[in-house]
C-alpha cells in the first residue's frame, strides 16, 4: 500500500534575495513541500516574476511568477506549515521568534539564533539527534512552534568533511583557508572595485565565527573514538572573498594525535553517509561527500553543482599525506544550495520524518 503524503505549504521570507531565490527554485520541484507564501519588504503586492532578479540557474517557475509578494506577518499565514527564513542578521532574530510564538516551525539560515543553547545548529548528516533540543526550546520559551538553524555556508564546507574525520579518527587540529564566492555576501553584494583584481580578506570577526560554528557542530558529532577531547583540538581559519559567483573553496590541513594514512581517510570520506541517506530524504544526495581523484579538481566552475542532487554534495579533492600525522585536502561547497537553501530544505525533511512537522 502506498501512503499518500499531504502537501506542506511553505512561506519563504526574503523570497527575492539570493537564498530566497534558491528556496523558490528547489521547492518548486519538491515532492511534498511547495512555495505557498512569498514574503518581502519593498515589493508587497507586486508579482514575484516582475520584481525578482533571478540570480540562479533556469528561470522563474511559471507557477511562481504570478504569485504576489506579501507582508512578513504570521497572522496572514493561517494555512502555512513551514517557515524558511534567510533573513539578514539582526532583522531575522525577532521575526523568527514572532513566528515561533505563533506556532510555526522556523528553519533559519540566519546567525541570530545559532548559539542559543536550546536551538539546534543542524547539519543533518552529522548531528541529527540535536533536533531533540526542540522539546527543551518549547518548554523553556513556552511556545508551540520552534526555531532550527543551519550553519554558515563557510562553516559547513569545512565541518562536513571534518565531522566525518572527527567521528572516526584522533583528529587534534585543522587549519583552514577559504576562498569564497561573491554570492555569500548577498545581492548586490560587494562593490566591484573592492573585489575585481583583488583577494578580499574577510577579517578576524568572520574567521572567529566560522571556527565557533565548526566547534559547536563537532561537539555534537557522535564519535567512535574517545580522544582527543574537543577542548584539546586546535582550529584556525583565514577567510577571503574573490570574484566567483557561487561556490566556496576551502583548503584544510588536518592533524592527528597518531599516525594516520591519507588513503584511509579518503576511504572514510568516500563511504561517509548519514541519517538523511538512510531515510532517503528527497534532498539528500546519495553521497554527501564526493571525493575526486584528479590532481586539479575540484574546480569551482565545474564542480559546484556536483552530485545526484545538484549542489548538495561537498566535493573533496587534492587529498595528500603531508607527514605521518597530517593530511591536506580541499573542499568545495555550493554556498547558496548546500550551504543555505538546500541545507534548510534537508533540515525540514528530517523534521517532517521525525514528527516535528506534521506530515
Curated annotation (Swiss-Prot):
- Binding residues annotated for NADP(+), in chain numbering: 16-19, 183-184, 335-336
Q: Which GO terms describe its molecular function?
A: aspartate-semialdehyde dehydrogenase activity; NAD binding; NADP binding; protein dimerization activity; RNA binding
Q: How is the cofactor bound?
A: Divalent metal cations such as Mg(2+) and Mn(2+) ions at 5 mM.
- Which reaction(s) are listed as its catalytic activity? 3-oxopropanoate + NADP(+) + CoA = malonyl-CoA + NADPH + H(+)
pH profile of the protein: Optimum pH is 7.2, with half-maximal activities at pH 6 and 8.
* Enzyme class, UniProt record, top EC level: oxidoreductase
Query: Per the UniProt entry, how does temperature affect activity?
Result: Optimum temperature is 85 degrees Celsius.
Q: Which residues form the active site?
A: 153 (acyl-thioester intermediate), 248 (proton acceptor)
Per the UniProt entry, the Enzyme Commission number(s) are 1.2.1.75
Q: How is its activity regulated?
A: Activated by dithioerythritol (5 mM) and inhibited by the thiol-blocking agent iodoacetamide (0.1 mM).
Q: Which GO terms describe its biological process?
A: methionine biosynthetic process; threonine biosynthetic process
What domain of life does the UniProt record list for this protein's source? Archaea
Keywords, A to Z? Answer: NADP, Oxidoreductase, RNA-binding
Entry's SMART domains? Answer: Semialdhyde_dh
Cofactor entry: Mg(2+); Mn(2+)
Pfam families associated with the record: Semialdhyde_dh, Semialdhyde_dhC
Instruction: Provide the transmembrane region boundaries.
Output: none
Q: Does the keyword RNA-binding apply?
A: yes
Q: Which PANTHER family match?
A: ASPARTATE-SEMIALDEHYDE DEHYDROGENASE
Q: How does it assemble?
A: Homodimer and possibly a tetramer.
What more is known?
This enzyme contains bound RNA, but the physiological role is not known.
Main role?
Catalyzes the reduction of malonyl-CoA to malonate semialdehyde, a key step in the 3-hydroxypropanoate and the 3-hydroxypropanoate/4-hydroxybutyrate cycles. Can also use succinyl-CoA and succinate semialdehyde as substrates but at a lower rate than malonyl-CoA.
Q: Which family does it belong to?
A: Belongs to the aspartate-semialdehyde dehydrogenase family.
Q: From the Swiss-Prot or TrEMBL record, give the protein name.
A: Malonyl-CoA reductase
Protein source organism: Sulfurisphaera tokodaii (strain DSM 16993 / JCM 10545 / NBRC 100140 / 7)
Per the record, the gene is mcr
